[in-house]
């Protein structure tokens, strides 16, 4: 039987070899090369972190967070580099979701 860590590392290498992964990486590199897109992206990630902290403490985002989220949505849709990145990221997420189901299937079986 192969070492489970070797299998995980092989999976990691396989993900990096996917065309969808490479497309996300190229889109992220394009964002990094554009000052406006990079600024919006960095601010968006910081905002996402704020929301995660709220969720971890059991707090709900208020109306100002909703307004800020809508603002980011408009900025992202209005920037072709950012909208391309998130589109490509969604395509990669399909693989990640499928892999998650496969990996957690044995754990799920234990809970039945």
UniProtKB/Swiss-Prot annotation:
Protein name: UPF0342 protein SPD_1206
Lineage: superkingdom: Bacteria
Pfam families given in the database record: Com_YlbF
Classification via HAMAP family: UPF0342
Membership in a protein family: Belongs to the UPF0342 family.
Entry-linked Gene3D superfamilies: YheA/YmcA-like
